[in-house]
Design a protein with these regions (language model features):
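Asp-based, Mg2+/Mn2+-dependent phosphohydrolase catalytic module
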Residues: 1-9, 101, 118-238
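N-terminal helical cap/lid subdomain that shapes the substrate entry/recognition surface
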Residues: 4-106, 119
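Short glycine/serine/threonine-biased micro-segments
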Residues: 15, 109, 174
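Residue-level marker of alpha-helix boundaries and capping positions
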Residues: 21, 90, 112, 166-168
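Residue-level detector of anion-binding/catalytic polar loops
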Residues: 40, 109, 186
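A broad detector of the eukaryotic-type serine/threonine protein kinase catalytic domain
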Residues: 81-88, 108, 139-142, 161-162
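Hydrophobic beta-strand core positions in alpha/beta domains
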Residues: 111-112, 189
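Conserved phosphate-coupling serine/threonine residues in phosphotransfer and NTP-handling enzymes
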Residues: 114-116
Length: 238
C-alpha cells in the first residue's frame, strides 16, 4: 500500500458551495416551487445530491410524482430565473480567490473539480474574473462518473501533473469529501449554509472559512509540508 506523501504540491477546489454559494439558491428555488404546490421538499433527500448529481434524488421527478402530473414549463422557467437571479447576486466566498492566487504565487498547481457542467463552472469563474487563477478545470463533461466517485479528482490530478497524494482537495460536502479521499487526496472541508449541519468528519480537517487562510495555514491544519518554489516564500510572495 502506497504511503501518502507529506509534501503538498497542489490545491484542488470544489466549485458549487465552495467558490460560489450556488447551493443555497438552487435549494431555495426548488423549495419555493414545492411550497407553491403545497408540498414539502425533503431535506434529507436533498442533501444526497449536494456536490453530486440528481441521480440519487430528482427534485422535479419527485414533486411530479407527488402531484400526479407534470410541472408546467412556465413553473420550470420561473424556477430557473429565480435560481439565476440569486446566484448572480452572490459574491465569491471569503478567502477563496486570495488562497488560489497565493497558492499559484508559491508555485503550487491549482485546479477545480466540479460535478456541474463545464459551461456552468467556467462561465461563472470567467464572470467572477478568477478563471485564470486555476491551471485546470474538470467538470462532469470530462468524466464517466461524478462525485462521490474519484474520477473528477483523478482527472484534475492528471491534468495538473501531480500525484493525488501530494494534493489537498478543498470541499464543502460529504459527496465531495468522499470523492477526494477515494482519489487518494487529502481533504479540508469548509461547510456552508446547506452543508453546515452535515457530518464532514471524514475530511482530514474542517475550517469554518477560508478568509485569511494562507497556503501554509491550510497544510498545517493536517500536519503536512508545503512544497515551495525556489525564490518564493510559503505565503506566495517573491
Amino acid at each position: 500500500m502506497r504511503v501518502r506523501s507529506p509534501l503538498v504540491r497542489a490545491f484542488v477546489f470544489d466549485f458549487d458551495g465552495l467558490i460560489l454559494d450556488t447551493e443555497e439558491p438552487v435549494y431555495l428555488s426548488w423549495l419555493e416551487v414545492y411550497q407553491a404546490h403545497g408540498e414539502e421538499l425533503p431535506y434529507d433527500r436533498w442533501i444526497e445530491i449536494v456536490g453530486s448529481s440528481t441521480a440519487a434524488f430528482d427534485p422535479r421527478g419527485y414533486l411530479e410524482q407527488r402531484l400526479g402530473r407534470a410541472l408546467t414549463q412556465d413553473v420550470l422557467d420561473r424556477r430557473i430565473e429565480r435560481r439565476t437571479a440569486m446566484v448572480l447576486a452572490q459574491a465569491i466566498l471569503p478567502g477563496v480567490a486570495e488562497l488560489a492566487a497565493a497558492a499559484r504565487e508559491a508555485g503550487l498547481r491549482v485546479g477545480v473539480a466540479s460535478s456541474a457542467s463545464s459551461q456552468w463552472v467556467k462561465g461563472h469563474l470567467e464572470r467572477l474574473g478568477i478563471l485564470d487563477r486555476f491551471d485546470c478545470v474538470r467538470s462532469r463533461d470530462d468524466v464517466a462518473h461524478v462525485k462521490p466517485e474519484p474520477d473528477l479528482y483523478l482527472a484534475v490530478a492528471a491534468c495538473l501533473g501531480v500525484d493525488p497524494a501530494e494534493t489537498i482537495a478543498i470541499e464543502d460536502s460529504p459527496n465531495g469529501i468522499a470523492s477526494a479521499k477515494a482519489a487518494g487526496m487529502w481533504c479540508v472541508a469548509v461547510p456552508n449554509v446547506i452543508t453546515g449541519g452535515l457530518d464532514l468528519s471524514h475530511a482530514d480537517a474542517v475550517v469554518t472559512t477560508l478568509q485569511g487562510v494562507t497556503p501554509p495555514d491550510l497544510v498545517r491544519k493536517i500536519g503536512l509540508t508545503l512544497w515551495v518554489h525556489e525564490n518564493r516564500d510559503p505565503d506566495g510572495r517573491r
